[in-house]
Amino acid sequence: MAQIAESTGHHGAEEEHNCTGIDHRKLLMWVFLSTDCLFFGALISTYMVYRGQSLVGPYPVDIINIPITTISTFVLLCSSFAMVMALSNTNRDNLKGIRIWLAGTAIMGMIFIGFQIVEFTEFAMEGLLLSTNLFGTTFFTLTGFHGAHVSIGIVWLWVMFYQSFKGKVGSKTALNVELCGLYWHFVDIVWIVIFTLLYLVGGFDAGPPIVG
Amino acid sequence: MATVASKQSQNSMLSNIWGWITTVDHKRIGILYGVTAFVMFLVAGIEAGIMRWQLSMPGLDVVSPDVYNQMFTMHGTTMVFFAIMPLNAAFFNYIIPLAIGARDVAFPRLNAFSYWTFLAAVLFMNFGFVVGAVPDGGWFAYAPLSEQPYSTNQGMEFWSIGLMLAAVSSAVAGLNFIVTIVNLRAPGMSLMRMPVFIWMSFVVQILLAFAIPVIAVGLIELTMDRLFGTVFFKPSAGGDPILWQHLFWIFGHPEVYILILPPMGIISDVLPAFSKKPLFGYPFIVFSGIAIGLMGWAVWSHHMFTVGLGPIAVSVFTITTMLIAVPTGVKIFNWIGTLWGGSIEYKTPMLFAVGFIAMFIIGGLSGVSHAVAPSDYQQQDTYYIIAHIHYVLFGGAILGIFSGIYFWFPKVTGKLLNEKLGKYHFWITFVGMNLTFFPMHYLGMNGMPRRIYTYATEYGWDNLNALSSFGYVILFIAMVIFIVNVITSLKSGEDAGHDPWNAPGLEWTIASPPPVYNFSDLPVVEGRDPYWIIKRRAIAEGKELPGPQALVDPSTVHLPDPSYWPAFTSLGLLIFATGFMIEIPVWFVKYPIAIVGGLLVFVGILAWSNEPITREKNH
């Protein structure tokens, strides 16, 4: 920063002018995450509107495995703790801690995605595909887009892990880790909503009531 | 010698083009937006002309019914997403940083990315014309009509994926401008000192950022239905096409305000400048704009009164729709209050602004008439609706945008647009639009449905249709006059000076066209209408009126460097989108080109985030 100010001469001083004092990137991330709520909100609404509307099976009650997904949910929630530790180590410039906790977060995310792959494969083998019924359509789309969010987070974490070897991660650039953390926690929170609605609440749904 | 010279000019032209591709300057990006959007405005206008030609007499056979479907779909889609929205974006880009006293937007490279992605969307969707698969499901693409069995070619994929690209562009731009307006206002420019155009833009950015994800989900679901066999909107599997309508209009109604609020902001800046008095009831206009932004989320089902949502839903949405007319009415009264007792100068921007008020009132009134559900049952899907939307979007948005073009053209180019041609342009547009769109009210009331490609003479719609088509010709002439005006004024227009209108805004305190760094020293704002305060003080103290801010050597000002990564990333996104149009099964991968595009996007983002914003110079 000092170097940049030097090279910009007398017009450099006011360059740091910022009305709220909140870093642009941090503000951007908060606003982006709040708009992402609408994205998941619309997908979750689609799922809820179509709950119990599937005309043919398999229905959730036939294949949803709550215990298994509870384990992967637990892992994902733990990864949020690891993310906090990574940020805390970044602020303290503890390079070893940064690497351990960044990698830990990413690996826990990968375990979660691994569980999801196993789950999807199992569902497919039991006859539930995207095109089978409304349950398959909405379930795979919603959890798939969540999985994509997690995957982007994992790539981001590994990129940061790599950068820690280039000396680019530390207290001076802690915002980079913080932004990644904000994103990661958000994706976790969304999963809490999805897990509650799709597994704990909707996991026992069957087909539409048979009239007559 | 000659070849050397031509080679040199060729080189400089290439580097010039490269300069535009890699630019991160909000002013250049604004010009790119404006020019692209105006070209698309003309394209959509020609599509409208084909429709008016076809309808000018009963039983004509200018185009086939299929082509007619394509024309109304592309006319609506292009006008909304590729003409009015980006014309507004041109103003956001060019004016917002200048009017809040900033050197650029908060994320200059992201801004470039928005433009290139918008261009990718334009090219992608209109590529349908090249391969003969033009979208034909109407601009709101109601399922199941937009679904596979009813729309068999790739047209609707061009539509839905193209709109997704546009959605990425707009959402990113929205986020960027929210941060810009929150963080980068000049010292002293508190929220309640911002020009109304900035306020309205701010509301619009929030609407964009929050409404776009909803349509994105709708588009994803539609595209997945078409490509991956999901059953979101397929009644045969229990899916409900009404869900598409909800998703589309939950976005679609805020979208209406995304289109109209910026022109409202423009005329709120133009009216005071040509009445020589401050905007009447500034806080009322600001808060009514915010109220419109909030209430815009609670009215969407008035597009769906005839769907059969039941009496309670219909009543609720009738009431909310009528309520939203209140803040709009408040604005209109305040604009008229601004004119009251002012020393009014009828320059061209002012003519367009006053024309906006008059035409928007007509559009607003017909709007209230279909807020009433029983009355709407008669009007749904008739030309009455077409008349309404054109009074608010042509009489409103387009007139407001022209007002803004005439107002800020001298700032952008340093040249004034010709007043005489401008006045011809205004009056011919004014007469032309009323001739084109007013008869549509009667046509609608007489039962002419929208989207029919021809009609029999026995219905008695001949004369009014002929009149409407004649109006189109007049509008066409008006546009020609405008283009002639722009070209001749650019060549040999009168020099504008830095402040041709004696205007109140910060953008007039600097030279025209503005230097690359905008402000050599950031201005300090002492109140609303900051430049008027400075000028008034100079007059009171008997001093000379202050000139434009002195120019300095641009290299002494800290500016972001040009970058090709935004354009590269957009190109990756375009390839990603195109990948879904070309099925090449390789092993278990269905769309390998999409994977290539996705990787390019990844590379682009990575390189972009590793690129320093300003390289160290002379080191």
Regions found by a protein language model. Give the residues of each.
Chain B
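Membrane-embedded and interfacial regions of multi-pass energy-transducing membrane proteins
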Residues: 2-619
